[in-house]
Every structure is written in C-alpha cells, then in structure tokens.
C-alpha cells in the first residue's frame, strides 16, 4: 500500500541535514547513510549517496528518474551466484 499523499514523502532528518550541507558547500564527496527507507527528494539530484546494503556502502548517483523512489531500491542486499548446474545436461 502506498503512503498517504497528505503525509508527504518520508526522509530521515539527519540525511536531510547532510544533503543541505553538501549542497551549500558544493561537495562532491559521497554522503554515507544507513537510511534505506528514505525517499529520494528533488534536492538529492546530482549528489552521490553511499547507501548501506548490510555489508558495505554502495555509491548511488541520484538522477531525475529516481525521485520518489526509496534509497534502498538502488543498493541490492543479496548477491545471486547462480543456480547449481544440471549434471545431466553436461553429458
């Protein structure tokens, strides 16, 4: 179920402070965050945000198409190594 429009998008306050500071200083260094639940706002466009995936911080460069999505959507948490090969098919 989607979030109510009257509530507006959710974004952690500490992340907003970091984004505002980076925008004011024109800093291109990635902003490190653990907040996968935060919605990407138009203020984030052009910034690189390092989103934690449970093991490391994955750099995510924010573009216009990402606005409205969550940060966690762009930092995958699972690594798929492939299914076991079928031994009968190899013969």
From Swiss-Prot:
Gene Ontology cellular component list: cytoplasm; small ribosomal subunit
Listed InterPro entries: Ribosomal_uS19, Ribosomal_uS19_bac-type, Ribosomal_uS19_CS, Ribosomal_uS19_SF
Gene: rpsS
GO term, biological process aspect, one: translation
Family matches, as Gene3D superfamilies: 30s Ribosomal Protein S19, Chain A (3.30.860.10)
Keyword rRNA-binding: yes
Residues in coiled coil: none
PANTHER family in the record: RIBOSOMAL PROTEIN S19P FAMILY MEMBER, SMALL RIBOSOMAL SUBUNIT PROTEIN US19M
Stated name of the protein: Small ribosomal subunit protein uS19
Family of this protein: Belongs to the universal ribosomal protein uS19 family.
Function: Protein S19 forms a complex with S13 that binds strongly to the 16S ribosomal RNA.
One term of GO molecular function: structural constituent of ribosome
Keywords: Ribonucleoprotein, Ribosomal protein, RNA-binding, rRNA-binding
Keyword NAD in annotation: no
């Amino acid at each position: 179920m989607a979030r109510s429009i009257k509530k507006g998008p959710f974004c952690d306050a500490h992340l907003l402070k970091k984004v505002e500071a980076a925008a004011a200083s024109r800093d291109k260094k990635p902003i490190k965050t653990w907040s996968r639940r935060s919605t990407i706002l138009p203020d984030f466009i052009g910034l690189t945000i390092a989103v934690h995936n449970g093991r490391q911080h994955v750099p995510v460069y924010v573009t216009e198409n990402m606005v409205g999505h969550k940060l966690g959507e762009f930092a995958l948490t699972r690594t798929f190594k492939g299914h076991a090969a079928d031994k009968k098919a190899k013969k």
